[in-house]
Regions:
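Internal nucleotide-binding/catalytic subdomain
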Residues: 1-106
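Active-site "cap" helix and flanking loop/linker of ATP-utilizing ligase/carboxylase catalytic domains
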Residues: 59-81, 99-150
Length: 150
């Protein structure tokens, strides 16, 4: 497969989810996307990484079915669902799942969140993604950009 990668991270609690700003990490050791893969040399989080239509497709084909599957299987999942995707000419392809906030993606996504993130996490841990505790500029992801270098 060929294409750029993107990370779509969602907070999940008892069948509910909220998608955060899409992010992309940069894994290669050297400039020009050369060298060995690392744990991440930096990341960018931006609304402009993918279109709203593509995010809707990822939600419809990956995030929502995953959360519905957890609910169907009676798995009381509360945490982050991290979908690592490759954007191919045939559409987004799931490369990996993680049940954590990606790093270094978190370092680029978290500064975009407004509000009481600690209270949001506590609420999610109790099974409720409370609207109003955090804000993404009144959309499900921010129009702002953030770059993180390690």
């Amino acid at each position: 497969m060929e294409g750029p990668e993107v990370s779509v991270i969602a907070a999940v609690a008892d069948g509910e989810y909220q998608i955060f700003t899409p992010a992309r990490d940069y894994k290669r050791l050297s400039d020009g996307d050369k060298g060995l893969n690392t744990g991440g040399m930096g990341a960018v989080a931006s609304r402009s990484l993918i279109s709203g239509e593509l995010l809707d497709q990822i939600e419809d084909e990956v995030i929502r079915p995953s959360v519905e599957g957890l609910t169907k299987d009676n798995m009381d999942f509360r945490g982050f669902l991290y979908a690592g995707l490759m954007l191919t000419p045939d559409g987004p392809k799931l490369l990996e799942y993680n049940c954590r906030f990606g790093d270094p993606e978190a370092q680029a996504v978290l500064p975009l969140i407004k509000g009481d993130f600690a209270a949001y996490l506590m609420s999610a841990a109790k099974g409720n993604l409370m609207d109003g505790l955090i804000d993404f500029d009144n959309t499900n992801f921010s129009w702002k950009n953030f770059v993180d270098f390690i």
